[in-house]
Amino acid sequence: MGLLFKQPEGTAGKAWPAILISGFVAFGGILFGYDTGTISGILAMPYWARTFSTGYRDSTGQLNVTSSQSSAIVSILSAGTFFGALGASPMGDIIGRRWGLIASNGIFVLGVVLQTIATSIPPFLAGRFFAGLGVGLISALVPLYQSETAPKWIRGFIVGAYQFAITVGLLLASVLNNATHHRNDSGSYRIPIAVQFAWSIILVGGMLILPETPRYLVKKDNIQAAARSLSKLRRLPEDHAAIREELAEIQANHSFEMSLGRSGYMECFQGNLLKRLVTGCLLQALQQLSGINFIMYYGTQFFKNSGFQNEFVITLITNCVNVGSTLPGLYAIDKWGRRPVLLTGAIGMAVSQLLVAVLGTTTTGQDSRGNIIVHDAAAQKAAIAFICLYIFFFAASWGPSAWVITGEIFPLKTRAKSLSMTTATNWLLNWALSFSTPYLVNYGDGNANLQSKIFFIWFGCCFLCIGFVHFMIYETKGLTLEEVDELYMEVDSARDSVKWQPRGVARGEKEAHGAETDFAVETAKGASEQQEVIGDAGRSL
């Protein structure tokens, strides 16, 4: 860490406690990625297919599930995550970010239990739904917790670590699937599913000892607890000037926001908050429409149907690329900024998807039974290489950046609500794509049989990403969450955000509100010094 990032000079305290705490919370991404990744391999396991088949036989004459059953099994997780993400706002605001994550794990474990014991499709579907409900809650609460605890100069890396954890979860799923798919018993699919208990236990164990976020505690008027939380995160005494100044900034900002009216869902759709919400929702939607989860959900099955040998190994390779490519993206987002990283990634993804589509379409055919005929083996290998190149560009840009940006562009009073809606958008598109993909790709009656042509669709969406970044994404590198709020209030065009410098959020109004605020930080210097600190904090904004 020290080789890549250096704490800015003059910054009081230590950054490593906040980095470790926020980094550990990213472990929630393991649950997300692993649960997403297991199903691709499980659908391709012969024993699972025979066990859960209702009598349908595929083109090879083997017992299997139908396209509609496969679609339901994969997409039901995303349906659960959609409702879970929407539920994250009331849960996070009522019981807190920390206890919300703990409760979410309980729901997730229920889903894992049902999937593990299932021997038919209905209980398996129920398990996938409840697991999705838990994952949806976690997927909104983790970036929320991270963005509210991370130091501003490394916030992109820390929140982006959530995406890294997702890729690690996907990789672990492919490793377990590859290790058990040859088994001719229920262990072939039950072992990969049951391993998820371990991830949940680790996350809950850590959350029991980690602090609540200081911004949530300020929102609840528990200023003493907020000071203690900041003290743990910055490794400074509660009465240290830096702690009191940061606490003053957080509380003054929240006081100013609340002076404009109580927060509700309708407020998320007003003024520049609507612009931020549209930006966040479109960002998450386009992340899904880039085609990444086609590879993650159906990659193993697609490679198998396309005539590739060792499809489990290919999936393992693509997941290794996904993990390794996320690391440079975490560095780049704080080094070069959000806009350059997203723009470069969008261009790289578009070119890669176009080449995969052209190679796959022009070098393969089908026989009368729908089996793929490969005319050029070298071109197929090249297509795999470009899929890996696409994954590199995605993992180094849009993968982590979507979570980073949506976690930092909303003000405190609507942050949980807005973030839950942007995350729900991600899962809504995730569900739509996972449900429709079998019908779009597979051969047979009622199916579009696009095969590799589907990559033309992903190319078109990636091309749209380029314009979206240029016109909609604000540059927020190196800003506190309060300064990001100021940026959106002062700058109308995303293109002008690069030149903006923070000067304090509505300085006059916030000083007035800050002067009336009781920070309740007990120190020997008494209330008069507290008032002086409030004034100093207001002038420093």
UniProtKB/Swiss-Prot annotation:
Keywords, comma-separated and alphabetical: Glycoprotein, Membrane, Transmembrane, Transmembrane helix, Transport
Major subcellular site: membrane
Gene3D superfamilies attached to this UniProt entry: MFS general substrate transporter like domains (1.20.1250.20)
Bilayer-crossing regions: 15-35, 72-92, 106-126, 129-149, 156-176, 191-211, 277-297, 313-333, 340-360, 384-404, 418-440, 454-474
A GO term for molecular function: carbohydrate:proton symporter activity
Keyword Membrane: yes
Residues bearing carbohydrate: 64, 178, 184, 253
Membrane topology according to the record: Multi-pass membrane protein
InterPro entries noted in UniProt: MFS_dom (IPR020846), MFS_sugar_transport-like (IPR005828), MFS_Sugar_Transporters (IPR050360), MFS_trans_sf (IPR036259), Sugar/inositol_transpt (IPR003663), Sugar_transporter_CS (IPR005829)
Compartment(s) of residence: Membrane
GO cellular component: membrane
Annotated family: Belongs to the major facilitator superfamily. Sugar transporter (TC 2.A.1.1) family.
Protein name (record): Major facilitator-type transporter ecdD
Organism whose genome encodes this protein: Aspergillus rugulosus (Emericella rugulosa)
Lineage: Eukaryota, Fungi, Dikarya, Ascomycota, Pezizomycotina
